[in-house]
């Protein structure tokens, strides 16, 4: 396999759609991976499929996980309400170890594909404070990936790429628009209904709306 391949985590939201477009612009053959992990906002899976089709990825996988069997998050446990006001500390929408689990499965697929690059749309500027979105986490996972895999041990190192890490939400929107991302296809809301309409109140909705406003770009989000 000689082409330039990348595995990209695609949630169906604004950030991950932007990352797919950026990777494609860099000449990568894009293989996207989404997760049906018991999240309450399952409309994002439909959004991920739409984005994958629109951006012409080579293959799109949806992996089933039962993270709601663990619970501990407002996104996987319906007995915990999604907060609709900003709070302090790490919010209850944090899903324990989610990005570690997702990246581990992406790493496995990348090794099978002989891809050396894995992209993730984490951000540490306009974000909710999740610990697994920080640069330190990304760097640590890359070190682990190259210790834990046959490819890494044999010197065919993996790179975990987080191109949005230091961008504001407005800069992310502008980058996506420059690459032709159709943000009307995406779903960011933690409480999106089955049609992908947003609540307009959760932290993810606030960050998204503020990003479009600051970027001077019309927000295509539909609300219920």
Swiss-Prot record:
Catalytic activity: 7-carboxy-7-deazaguanine + NH4(+) + ATP = 7-cyano-7-deazaguanine + ADP + phosphate + H2O + H(+)
Cofactor(s) required, per the database record: Zn(2+)
InterPro entries reported for this sequence: QueC, Rossmann-like_a/b/a_fold
Pathway where it operates: Purine metabolism; 7-cyano-7-deazaguanine biosynthesis
Record Gene3D superfamilies: HUPs
GO molecular function: ATP binding; ligase activity, forming carbon-nitrogen bonds; zinc ion binding
SUPFAM superfamilies membership: Adenine nucleotide alpha hydrolases-like (SSF52402)
Keywords annotated in UniProt: ATP-binding, Ligase, Metal-binding, Nucleotide-binding, Queuosine biosynthesis, Zinc
EC annotation from Swiss-Prot or TrEMBL: 6.3.4.20
A GO biological-process term: queuosine biosynthetic process
Residues binding Zn(2+), per UniProt: 189, 199, 202, 205
Cofactor note (record): Binds 1 zinc ion per subunit.
Binding site for ATP: 10-20
One Pfam assignment: QueC
Similarity-based family: Belongs to the QueC family.
NCBIfam families for the chain: 7-cyano-7-deazaguanine synthase QueC
Xref: HAMAP family: QueC
Function: Catalyzes the ATP-dependent conversion of 7-carboxy-7-deazaguanine (CDG) to 7-cyano-7-deazaguanine (preQ(0)).
The name this protein goes by in its record: 7-cyano-7-deazaguanine synthase
Lineage: Bacteria, Pseudomonadati, Pseudomonadota, Gammaproteobacteria, Pseudomonadales
């Amino acid at each position: 396999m000689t082409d330039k391949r990348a595995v990209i985590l695609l949630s169906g939201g604004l950030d991950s759609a932007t990352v797919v477009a950026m990777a494609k612009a860099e000449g990568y053959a894009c293989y996207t991976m989404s997760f049906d992990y018991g999240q309450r906002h399952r409309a994002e899976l439909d959004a991920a499929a739409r984005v994958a089709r629109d951006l012409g990825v080579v293959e799109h996988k949806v992996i089933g996980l039962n993270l709601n069997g663990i619970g501990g998050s407002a996104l996987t446990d319906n007995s915990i309400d999604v907060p609709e006001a900003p709070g302090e500390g790490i919010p209850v929408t944090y899903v324990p170890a989610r990005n570690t689990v997702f990246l581990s499965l992406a790493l496995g697929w990348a090794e099978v594909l002989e891809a050396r690059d894995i992209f993730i749309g984490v951000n540490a500027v306009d974000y909710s404070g999740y610990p697994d979105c920080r640069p330190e986490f990304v760097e640590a996972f890359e070190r682990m990936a190259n210790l834990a895999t046959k490819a890494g041990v044999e010197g065919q190192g993996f790179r975990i790429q987080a191109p949005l890490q230091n961008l504001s939400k407005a800069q992310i929107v502008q980058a996506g628009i420059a690459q032709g991302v159709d943000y009307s296809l995406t779903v960011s809301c933690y409480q999106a209904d089955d049609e992908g309409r947003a609540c307009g109140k959760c932290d993810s909705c606030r960050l998204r709306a503020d990003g479009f406003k600051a970027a001077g770009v019309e927000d295509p989000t539909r609300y219920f």
